């Protein structure tokens, strides 16, 4: 048996069909081989942006082709939701109140300093107002944590370690945490009742 043949009914190279055409209308030259028919194919695929029917790009050759064509059909309607609001059969997807609210993603994490300039806002919930008086405690704790971490890094790198300041900062941090913990249960019980 010759090499490359597996059976008597396998097709030879001359019997194989041509590869499939993915866009047959682009390769179909039987209808017309004029450049106008090629332009019409692309005109069906792309909607012109201008109302006059001129193609996007505005090349001089394209203008002469568009002038040779008959009057274009009226432009298609805009996609749903992009037309004028008077032509929409449904109300706007966004309520009008959403546009007036400023975008402040960090407002939840920010507590303004207490003082007469703090005005009660409808956006700020009432339970957070007792927290304003103790706003300095978390900030002080952060500062203490940073100083403690700096001392620990100095120990790791071998640049020197001050055991007195480290123990003092640790004790101060523990004291602040205890003070914060004793105040929190009172706040919770007051807010629950």
UniProtKB/Swiss-Prot annotation:
UniProt superkingdom: Eukaryota
Compositional bias segments (type: Pro residues): 71-82
Region of interest (Disordered), ranges: 55-94
InterPro entries: C11orf91-like
Descriptive protein name: Uncharacterized protein C11orf91
Organism: Homo sapiens
Gene name of the encoded protein: C11orf91
């Amino acid at each position: 048996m010759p090499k490359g043949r597996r059976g008597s009914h396998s097709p030879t190279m001359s019997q194989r069909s041509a590869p499939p055409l993915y866009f047959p209308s682009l390769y179909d030259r039987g209808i017309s081989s004029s450049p106008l028919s090629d332009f019409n194919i692309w005109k069906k695929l792309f909607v012109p942006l201008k109302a006059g029917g001129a193609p996007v790009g505005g090349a001089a050759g394209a203008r002469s082709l568009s002038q040779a064509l008959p009057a274009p059909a009226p432009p298609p309607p805009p996609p749903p939701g992009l037309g004028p609001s008077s032509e929409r059969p449904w109300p706007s997807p966004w309520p009008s109140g959403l546009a007036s609210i400023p975008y402040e993603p960090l407002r939840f994490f920010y507590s303004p300093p207490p003082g007469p300039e703090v005005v009660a806002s409808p956006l700020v919930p009432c339970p957070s107002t007792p927290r304003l008086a103790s706003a300095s405690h978390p900030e002080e704790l952060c500062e203490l944590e940073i100083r403690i971490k700096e001392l620990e890094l100095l120990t790791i790198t071998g640049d020197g370690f001050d055991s007195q300041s480290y123990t003092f900062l640790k004790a101060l941090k523990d004291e602040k945490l205890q003070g914060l913990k004793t105040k929190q249960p009172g706040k919770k019980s007051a807010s629950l009742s």
